[in-house]
Amino acid sequence: MATDKKEEEKPVKRVKTPETLRGMKDILPDEQIYWEYFRRKAREISAAYSFGRIDMPILEDEKLFVRTVGKQTDIVEKEMYNFIDKGESKVALRPEATASVARAYINHGMLNLPQPVKLWYMGPMFRYDRPQSGRYRQFHQYGLEVIGGPDSVVDAQLILIAVRLFEDLGLKVKVEINSIGTATTRQEYKIELIAYARKHRKELCEDCTRRLSRNPLRLLDCKQ
């Protein structure tokens, strides 16, 4: 008995080719030479200034970033990759590294070491941000942290290291130094900022309207 050809023909299902998630990027072999060059320069300058390397977990307790970065910041409110794991713990992919370094300093009793403790790190961070040219949701960060040292001296040294690193990479940079002032002057500035913002309340975006009463200095961080 002949079978109708149309009945034999079945639609072919096309399998969608897997792609990287939005805001993520593969680093291909021909790019690795640049990454390795930067890593080598970063290692060399960190060692030259007596910084020790530290590697922290990519995954941390969500509360670590809520407490240290700030509950009302864009990072915590909008940009963290966070979820509840199979053990019902609230965890987050690290959006930055300073909080993790501070946690490690406490967890491993580094307070008992000769101060200041100088640490450097390098690795991927994650923020659910709007991807743009050269800006990804997984990005790589090199950083230095000094805990237990005089602030002004540490600030000067970190600025010097940053300039030297750029110079070692063959980049010409112009350094502009800003200051958030002292605790006293910052409070005075905050009062003036609130007064100005209230006069222009109708021009504020939704985020800034909320920040005005909760954390006025964050008005300066408006992305609109």
Task: Please describe what each predicted stretch is.
Residues 2-224:
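Extended, charged alpha-beta segments that form solvent-exposed binding/catalytic grooves
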